[in-house]
């Protein structure tokens, strides 16, 4: 039986463009906040890492809180779209605040400024915006193929934006005056772009009526399915093993991204050319985009996402191992590093494309086993993973830089720092890919749902 289709091509493209706005925040923040704070503001990377870790203590609570609020929201715009729209206003303001720390403040005040702005951005505004954006996957269509297509469009825009930001930001900062003024101006430009694109994305789609989502028009039944408190929501998530696996996978992916962002330091202090960071960004993002183009076709051909995800991530793991080998062979092997980096990214692409569809399947699993509709709460794993994983990853990089005696005033770093940069950029990404591959090999939620439906 052919599934009903709900979306036009422009709905999918409009939805996907929302991650331009998301990555104007996330790619900019994760790739450059540490080098901005250490080399421009002059803060200690170890202290910055600790502040980020402290900030992350709030994230788990706010993710479930906002996810639950989305599930219980009833408005003319739907459940998720209001949160996506208004949450981004706060994202734009706090993003600028992070990259506009006054240089004439005392250091204690600078640390406090960063902590407050970073916490508000991550624990409040980005949480509301990103969970709502992700939840739309399950709220504007019930067609699994369309959900995969939405994920592919989303991450094509995400990686294209990430590539552009990683390629042009350092040059843009210099062109706009350099130093603190350059970073502040770039942040303002990115925030304005994000606001415009996020607004367009919100109004490019329309949520399905709640009765159609629930397969019932009985309002009392719908209200009963949504009747649970914050503690019960947390229990529903914890009781879904597939949610837990996706959440851990998401966190590991973001830590991976934080380690890859150390490419700015690796290119500067080991390869001797900071512009190579942009070249490596191309080697990562172009293959990812290519993989995303073909992901919907491959999912359809293989009748599901499981085999594709496991096989492609196995390729990624092997390739990251070869990147490490090439890196330790010496800085003259940049070509080999770029080649294996590209192959690894190609292997990571399918999971990025179908991940939101897998989360929708996890939400369906909770519906089939607990008869509770928790779409918004279920998608908290996306925001939680981005913030907790990205924050923890950035914190770890700060701690490791401090432990290895990194000194931003030196043009040549000590051997302890050089060795640590190699571990962060070469070894840890391989180890993380291996763990993710193991988790994906147990992500059999599609099969579980089929068995549950057959038993009804």
What are these regions (language model features)?
Residues 2-456:
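Membrane-embedded alpha-helical bundles of multi-pass transporters/translocases
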């Amino acid at each position: 039986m052919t599934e009903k289709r709900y979306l036009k091509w422009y709905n999918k493209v409009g939805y996907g463009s929302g991650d331009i706005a998301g990555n104007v925040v996330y790619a900019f923040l994760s790739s450059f906040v540490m080098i901005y704070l250490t080399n421009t503001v002059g803060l200690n990377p170890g202290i910055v890492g600790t502040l980020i870790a402290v900030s992350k203590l709030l994230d788990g609570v706010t993710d479930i809180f906002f996810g639950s609020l989305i599930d219980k929201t009833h408005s003319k715009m739907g459940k998720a779209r209001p949160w996506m729209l208004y949450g981004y206003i706060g994202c734009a303001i706090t993003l600028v605040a992070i990259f506009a720390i006054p240089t004439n403040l005392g250091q204690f005040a600078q640390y406090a400024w960063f902590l407050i702005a970073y916490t508000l951005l991550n624990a409040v505004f980005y949480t509301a915006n990103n969970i709502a954006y992700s939840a739309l996957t399950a709220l504007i269509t019930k067609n699994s193929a369309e959900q995969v297509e939405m994920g592919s469009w989303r991450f094509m825009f995400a990686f294209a934006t990430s590539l552009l930001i990683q390629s042009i930001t350092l040059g843009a900062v210099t062109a706009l005056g350099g130093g603190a003024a350059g970073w502040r101006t770039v942040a303002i430009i990115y925030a304005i772009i994000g606001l415009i694109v996020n607004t367009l994305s919100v109004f490019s789609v329309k949520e399905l009526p709640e009765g159609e989502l629930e397969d019932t028009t009985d309002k009392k039944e719908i209200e009963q399915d949504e009747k649970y408190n914050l503690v019960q929501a947390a229990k529903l998530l914890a009781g879904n093993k597939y949610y837990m696996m996706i959440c851990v996978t998401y966190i590991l992916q973001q830590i991976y991204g934080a380690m890859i962002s150390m490419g700015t330091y690796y290119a500067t202090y080991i390869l001797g050319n900071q512009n190579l960071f942009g070249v490596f960004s191309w080697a990562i993002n172009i293959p990812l985009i290519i993989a995303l183009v073909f992901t919907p076709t491959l999912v359809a051909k293989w009748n599901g996402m499981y085999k594709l995800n496991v096989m492609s991530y196995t390729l990624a793991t092997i390739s990251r191992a070869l990147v490490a080998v090439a890196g330790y062979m010496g800085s003259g092997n940049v070509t080999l590093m770029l080649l294996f980096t590209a192959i690894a990214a190609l292997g990571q692409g399918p999971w990025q494309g179908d991940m939101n569809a897998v989360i929708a399947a996890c939400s369906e699993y909770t519906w089939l086993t607990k008869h509770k509709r928790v779409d918004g709460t279920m998608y908290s794993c996306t925001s939680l993973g981005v913030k907790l994983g990205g924050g923890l990853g950035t914190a770890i990089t700060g701690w490791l830089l401090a432990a290895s005696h990194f000194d931003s005033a030196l043009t040549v770093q000590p051997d302890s720092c050089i060795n640590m940069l190699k571990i962060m950029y070469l070894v840890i990404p391989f180890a993380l890919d291996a763990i993710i591959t193991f988790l994906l090999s147990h992500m059999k939620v599609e099969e579980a749902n089929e068995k549950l439906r057959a038993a009804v």
